């Protein structure tokens, strides 16, 4: 009989095992489990795999930039100029159409805008990955009690020659390594 300490099934849970061995069995979720949930999700990982959606989005002059830092900054500016944040937070896409809808309407939540940024950076040959985090407005991140509900924001993380860079395209004013204040 499972007994959850929260209605959110992604939080730590303990269950009583009625098998022959008896006793308590832990069904605790870890941050690795959360990562897997995100990458398996149709609203996050599956969207990132849809490379064909963005293959013709970037102008050729941006694709041709050879310096990786300059290319990443140019892609950031491109997304900032052409897409608008609707002021809704999220670590993933929330519209039915996902990234395709963002490409058509040019408006999306923070997850959609920055997942598009990551997809464009990857399509241009950069080593971009999503970095999912919690904003101050979402509350303190409880690292001892992993829960996907704690996460409400995603930014692009790019490794350029061993140097980490963060990119956030939700604000028209951010630059590399600057995340919009929550």
Annotate each language-model stretch with its function.
Residues 1-76, 80-87:
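Secretory-pathway-linked proteins and extracytosolic
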Residues 24, 61, 65, 103-107, ...:
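Hydrophobic alpha-helical scaffolding
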Residues 28-30, 91-94, 115:
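Phosphate/nucleotide-binding catalytic core
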Residues 51-57, 94-98, 136-137:
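Short acidic (Asp/Glu) and glycine-rich catalytic loops that position anionic groups and cofactors
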Residues 64-69, 81-87, 105-106, 118-129, ...:
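Secondary-structure transition/capping motifs at alpha-helix termini
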Residues 76-77, 101-104, 114-119:
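Contiguous, well-ordered alpha-helical segments that form the cores/surfaces of helical PPI scaffolds
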Residues 87-107:
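Short, conserved helix/loop micro-motifs enriched in His/Cys and acidic residues
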Residues 96, 112-182:
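Hydrophobic/aromatic-rich core segments of domains that either
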């Amino acid at each position: 009989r499972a007994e959850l300490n929260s209605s959110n099934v992604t939080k730590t849970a303990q269950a009583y095992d009625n098998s022959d061995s008896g006793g308590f069995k832990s069904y605790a979720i870890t941050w690795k489990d959360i990562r897997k949930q995100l990458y398996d999700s149709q609203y996050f990982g599956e969207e990132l795999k849809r490379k064909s959606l963005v293959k013709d989005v970037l102008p050729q002059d941006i694709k041709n930039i050879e310096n990786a830092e300059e290319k990443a900054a140019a892609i950031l500016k491109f997304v900032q100029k052409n897409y608008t944040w609707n002021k809704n937070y999220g670590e993933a896409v929330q519209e039915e159409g996902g990234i395709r809808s963002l490409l058509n309407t040019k408006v999306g939540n923070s997850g959609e805008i920055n997942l598009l940024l990551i997809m464009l950076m990857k399509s241009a040959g950069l080593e971009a990955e999503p970095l999912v985090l919690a904003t101050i407005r979402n509350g303190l991140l409880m690292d001892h009690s992993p829960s996907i509900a704690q996460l409400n924001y995603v930014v692009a993380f790019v490794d350029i020659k061993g140097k980490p860079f963060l990119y956030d395209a939700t604000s028209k004013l951010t630059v590399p390594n600057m995340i919009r204040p929550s």
